[in-house]
A protein has these predicted regions:
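Conserved residues at the C-terminal ends of beta-strands
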Residues: 117
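PIN-domain endoribonuclease scaffold, especially VapC-family toxins
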Residues: 3-5, 24-94, 104, 108-112
């Protein structure tokens, strides 16, 4: 069975930043997974901001997108009502927009591997 893999900001940061404490672990795990990795624009935006101090980090992020290693597979316009409901439902947690989009993506891709932590 083929699985789509949904990634969050932490995975992208660890993949790109060689100084990240999880870099080796993430790169080893991703060798086992066929691209593309799925994500959303909110994750790309968070990653862009957090990569500002990583030498060539933003360039690496754009290259991953250009090479289709990572693809944006979420349409906020189409899912806005559901996202608003998720943000309301989890307001006590709280969740970010990126978190809500990833939750929705896991619902849209039931065969996804979306919990990827050590």
């Amino acid at each position: 069975m083929h699985y789509e893999v949904i990634v969050d900001t932490g995975i992208l940061l660890a993949l790109i930043d060689r100084n990240d404490s999880h870099h080796t672990w993430v790169t080893e795990r991703l060798k086992e997974i066929a691209p593309p990795l799925l994500t959303c624009e909110a994750v790309i935006s968070e990653s862009w901001f957090l990569l500002q101090r990583v030498k060539r980090g933003r360039e690496a992020l754009l290259q991953l997108l250009a090479q289709k290693q990572i693809i944006i597979q979420f349409d906020l316009d189409a899912e806005l009502v559901t996202i608003m409901a998720l943000l309301s439902r989890y307001q006590s947690v709280p969740v970010s927009l990126a978190d809500a989009e990833l939750i929705r993506m896991s619902e849209l891709y039931p065969n996804s591997l979306n919990v990827y932590s050590r």
